[in-house]
A protein has these predicted regions:
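Formylglycine-dependent sulfatase
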Residues: 1-180
Length: 180
């Protein structure tokens, strides 16, 4: 955006599942080449003494975005695909912190922190009742949960991306498919 303050550095925070310390070339990996990540590491900040608050997806993401230990907050274990939004809009997030410092914020990729106000009550055929815009993100293009949990859709700014009303989405973790 040409109206943004360009005196501040860009911040790109990459959060990956199952990526070990020795899996990237910039940390000593020999069997895989990661030239783009190497460049980010050489031109930015490369952490050499960082620790995860949890070993799995949902709780580690929760802690990273809120600054709270997930193990102290009930309901922050690995989220089901139809989980309601675990981080509540009134909670202060990393996105809120960046926005208050004048940054534009965005989230991209795997979310896995729930969407909508309540578990199993999302209407995937309409704008979601609670999404990343409520947590300080100006823009989002995310996968709702994981590739092995329905709905396997991308969500852009609180709505299913490329939604086709002639093919409505129904998600149930209780009802079987016809014929099952």
């Amino acid at each position: 955006n040409k109206n943004q303050n360009t005196d501040k550095p860009n911040v790109i925070f990459i959060y990956a599942d199952d990526l070990g310390y020795g899996d990237l070339e910039c940390y000593g990996a020999k069997n895989v080449q990661t030239p783009n990540v190497n460049r980010l590491a050489s031109e930015g900040i490369r952490f050499i003494n960082a620790h995860a608050t949890a070993a799995t997806s949902t709780p580690s993401r929760y802690s990273m975005l809120t600054g709270e230990y997930a193990w102290r907050k009930p309901g922050t274990d690995v989220a089901a695909g139809n989980a309601g939004m675990i981080i509540r809009p009134e909670q202060y997030t990393m996105a809120d912190m960046f926005k208050s410092s004048g940054y534009a914020t965005g989230a991209f990729g795997k979310w896995h922190l729930g969407l909508g106000d309540k578990t199993a009550q999302q209407d995937w055929n309409a704008p979601l009742s609670a999404s990343l815009g409520d947590l300080g993100f100006d823009y989002s293009y995310i996968m709702a949960a994981t590739a092995d949990r329905v709905p396997c859709v991308f969500i852009e700014n609180g709505q299913v991306a490329n939604y086709d009303p002639s093919a409505p989405i129904e998600v149930s973790y209780i009802k079987n498919f016809p014929g099952e």
